[in-house]
């Protein structure tokens, strides 16, 4: 049985089809779930956990960021947990929402000399970990979260996105 029930919403032009995004996100996020269960002993309910992914543009994510975080600017990814969860805690039936902005992902991928798909993979994993209570508000949290991201991405065949950088 699948651990995740992923709901996809494409709210801007330029994204792939919902079917392609669903297949891509399912592969990435199921790898993240498997990793967390195996390596971090993350508990998971027997029933699938619902997760919403919104693929949007810079303008929409800027509005969401302004409304919910008082930051009137576009960003790459926003995560909204359905319920507060500490790392290692048991998720409920609804995990939360992840919102991703296409233009920012494209721009950052170019700046980082990465493919769009590789950068999108990283941002999906990053946003997903936020739903499990991981954060990067201080150096210790950032190191833990970045380590998890790097290890999950390695399972997916991707290199360390933080190589040569200071923690967030």
From Swiss-Prot:
Q: Where in the cell is it found?
A: Cytoplasm
Q: Which GO terms describe its molecular function?
A: metalloendopeptidase activity; RNA endonuclease activity; zinc ion binding
Reported EC number(s) for this entry are 3.1.-.-
Q: How is the cofactor bound?
A: Binds 1 zinc ion.
* Biological processes, Gene Ontology terms: rRNA processing
What keywords sit in the KW lines? Cytoplasm, Endonuclease, Hydrolase, Metal-binding, Nuclease, Ribosome biogenesis, rRNA processing, Zinc
Q: Does the keyword Cell wall biogenesis/degradation apply?
A: no
Which residues of this UniProt protein bind Zn(2+)? 126, 130, 136
Family membership:
Belongs to the endoribonuclease YbeY family.
Q: Quote the function comment for this protein.
A: Single strand-specific metallo-endoribonuclease involved in late-stage 70S ribosome quality control and in maturation of the 3' terminus of the 16S rRNA.
What is the protein name for this chain? Answer: Endoribonuclease YbeY
Tell me which species this is from.
Agrobacterium fabrum (strain C58 / ATCC 33970) (Agrobacterium tumefaciens (strain C58))
